[in-house]
Amino acid sequence: MLTSSLAFDIAQFFPLLNHHLLALILGKAGFDPQVVKFFLNYLVNRKTKYFWNNFSSSTVNINMEVGQGSAFSPILLALYLALVLHILEKHLKNLDLKISILSFVNDSLLIIQSKSFQTSNTCLFSSYNIAFNLHSKFGLVVKHSKTEVFHFSRSQETFSPSSLNLSSLGSPILYPKDTCRSLRFIFDRKLLFCQYIDFYANKAISIVKYMKILSNLIRGLNPQQKQLLYRSYALPIALYGFQIWYYNKAPLSYSLKILGKLQRRAALWIVGAFKTVLTFGIEAITSLIPIHLHLQKLSRRSQLRVYSLSTNHILQSLIENNSNTFTHLYPISLSSLTRH
């Protein structure tokens, strides 16, 4: 089976929310009429003036709809978008399009699994057409310029998926890329995450290089301060989102090699040692945990966070049932992926 995805972005998501439709959604959701009335007039018919020294501008209308920095924005957009996704799922189900939908604020993703890229492209085209028209009816604008298609495959054969022609919808022809960037994550077609690890490791290495400038100050930095600076600033960047590639039976030779080079470079800088010093020795002197043990520690700590969630949280059903809270686990349980 081949997995394909199509990512699209909603332009000016917060300012485009329709107040009247939002009020109908709140009323349908069972909110108090006074609350519905409040949001019906929320940030509507507002005016402002600009003052600069002795200059004052004329009155300007600023109907902001829902402000992006408002504390209400996350809640309102979730209620607004939930209806859009609910209707979209119904349309796709009626057309027998086996598409999965993921959404994070204004970034959405359509995912399909099929036996050929041609079938995937056909389903993605139909699904995107439905999603685009549905968002337009809700007053939301989809950015065609940010729409991307990506195909996943671990086949060792020549990988040449066909392009997706969306020109009839006003979007350009989409050509699959070698990597896909989403929410600061970098995905490759085989999900090996080599480019992802390289990107953040190089970022951390650059930080270690720039840290040397701090050592040239009048007072400089002692080894203890250098070690603290590396652990609190450079290392968290290198290990950003490590849970996505660090799991049971995952190939770790490449990632441990790259991260090991990073830590060795930092350790040499901390004590000012020669490059010929052994890695284990320099890590012991600088009190740095070997990178593979540090990853194990962070992984176990992240797994413990699930116990701080409420018993009816959706993530509880994805993890191994130790407390017998759920009699039936999710069909694709993550218990086999969270042991290391």
Which residues are covered by each model-predicted region?
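Active-site palm subdomain of RNA-directed nucleic acid polymerases
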Residues: L76-K115
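Basic, alpha-helical interaction scaffolds
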Residues: S171-W245
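Conserved pre-motif C helix in the palm subdomain of viral-like polymerases
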Residues: A11-F14, I62-L92, A131
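Extended C-terminal regions of large enzymes
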Residues: L262, K275, G281-H340
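Short, conserved non-catalytic motifs in the polymerase core
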Residues: S4-A7, F51-L76, I111-S114, I218-N222
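Short, conserved micro-motifs composed of acidic
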Residues: N54, V141-D178
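Mobile genetic element proteins and their domesticated derivatives, centered on retroelements
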Residues: D9, L26, F39, Y50, ...
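Conserved catalytic palm subdomain of right-hand nucleotidyl-transferase polymerases, strongest
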Residues: M1-L24
